[in-house]
Design a protein with these regions (language model features):
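Surface-exposed extracytoplasmic segments
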Residues: 1-214
Length: 214
């Protein structure tokens, strides 16, 4: 968890994910991301889901949205990206690698604010029942029922799709640490980002899947 500004460590509750609910239906899948503080009216932050289709620790699909402006469903400022060349995660998925040049993260844009193969693919809104959360709805066919790992994230720092995974872009020293007792405290290059561990759907995990929630 790094929902803090760089160097001065100012906490940002609008980036701090408390929990996430995912409900998969025959037509639509719904995700609700709950934050520590009220969802802002506007801002540069992004929220979303990362999907690992083959449970190897590498994200395959990235769903992201800007701050929803209304409790009405909208496709505005919503994107879906895909990693076609499998470089997300670097050499060791879900672990810190030495900074690697040439990684391109999520390089393929599948959906952008209603533009794409299916203009109805993904919708978002502010949660009308909870000011500290947002809702994402996407067609279940985007991923299917074959089983996958998923996690949620919030970002108001690097905001760089081509830099995923962030932990493969910086040394531990340059990234810094959020823990006051650490010799590399405070947070430096890797800031204002929060992610969850990975939950599963559609299969029984062995317990060895990278990033799996305990």
């Amino acid at each position: 968890e790094r929902p803090f500004t760089a160097d001065d460590m100012v906490y940002q509750g609008t980036i701090d994910i408390i929990r996430v609910n995912l409900k998969v239906g025959p037509t639509w899948t719904y995700a609700i991301i709950y934050l520590a503080e009220d969802l802002p009216e506007n801002g540069t932050m992004k929220y979303g889901l990362e999907i690992d289709l083959d449970e190897n620790g590498r994200g395959d699909l990235l769903i992201q949205t800007g701050v929803p402006r209304s409790i009405d469903w909208s496709v505005n400022d919503v994107q879906v990206y895909q990693d076609l060349d499998g470089d997300v995660g670097g050499e060791r998925p879900m672990k810190n690698d030495d900074p690697v040049e040439g990684l391109n993260g999520y390089e393929s844009l599948l959906f952008d604010s209603g533009e794409g193969g299916d203009p109805d693919l993904i919708w978002v809104r502010r949660n009308p029942d909870d000011p500290k959360s947002l809702q994402i709805a996407y067609k279940t066919d985007l991923i299917g029922y074959t089983g996958y790992l998923w996690s949620a994230w919030a970002d108001d720092g690097l905001l760089a799709i081509d830099y995923r995974d962030y932990n493969d872009r910086f040394t531990e020293e340059s990234a810094g640490s959020p823990y006051p007792g650490s010799p590399i405290y405070p947070i430096k290059s890797l800031y204002l980002i929060d992610t969850t561990c990975r939950s599963y759907f559609g299969f029984t995990p062995t317990g060895n899947e990278p990033g799996l929630c305990p």
